[in-house]
Structures are given as structure tokens and as C-alpha cells.
Amino acid sequence: MAVNIYDTANQMEQEIRQTSEYKSLQEAFAEVRKDEHASALYSKFQDVQSNLQQKQMNGEELTEEEIKNVHEIADQIEKVDLIKDLMDKERNMNQLFSDVSQIIVKPIQELYKN
């Protein structure tokens, strides 16, 4: 029997959309987007996070200004319940992906274990 792993992956993509984790994330994201302040702050947070990740990948050190900026944004985010809720839903989604990833890589882990 031939297995088309891409069909399985496409089915998984559709099933992810039906999970409570995805639906909760989708709702939380919509709520953040509806709130102008929360949306702008979350976008700023994403930009800063992306820039920091890029610097880390390039092996660059963070400047004092960048560290200060990260702390300021984190403090602001802590005061916005919509963003805190969204980030909680993101953590739940990431946990789902982590669990699924462990299942997917199990054959490789077993291969190298023996």
C-alpha cells in the first residue's frame, strides 16, 4: 500500500482548524485586532520579537536600548488582558504542535534508539 504523506499532512491541517485550541486562538486574535491599542501593542511586540530573533540567529548581542525596549513592551503587555489571553491561547496551540511533533518524530527516535 502506497502512503502519500502529503495527503495526511493536508488532512492534519484541516483537522487543526477544527481543534478547540485553534478556535480559541482565532477568537482571541480577533478580539485583539478589534481593540486599536491592543492591536498596535501586539504588532509592536511581534516586530521587536522578530528583530531580537534575527539578532540571535546572527550571533549579535542586544544593546542596552533593545533590552530596555523589551522590558517596557513586556510591562505594557502585562496590563492588557486581551493580549495576555491571546498569548495564553498561543501557548496552548504551541503545546498541541509539540505533542503532534513528538508523535511525528517517534519513528526516527525509535530508529536511533535501537
Swiss-Prot record:
SUPFAM superfamilies xref list: YheA/YmcA-like (SSF158622)
Disulfide bridge partners, by residue number: none
Cited InterPro entries: Com_YlbF, YheA/YmcA-like_dom_sf
Signal peptide (UniProt feature, chain positions): none
The organism's place on the tree of life at top rank: Bacteria
Similarity comment: family membership: Belongs to the UPF0342 family.
Annotated protein name in UniProt: UPF0342 protein PEPE_0673
Organism phylogeny: Bacteria, Bacillati, Bacillota, Bacilli, Lactobacillales
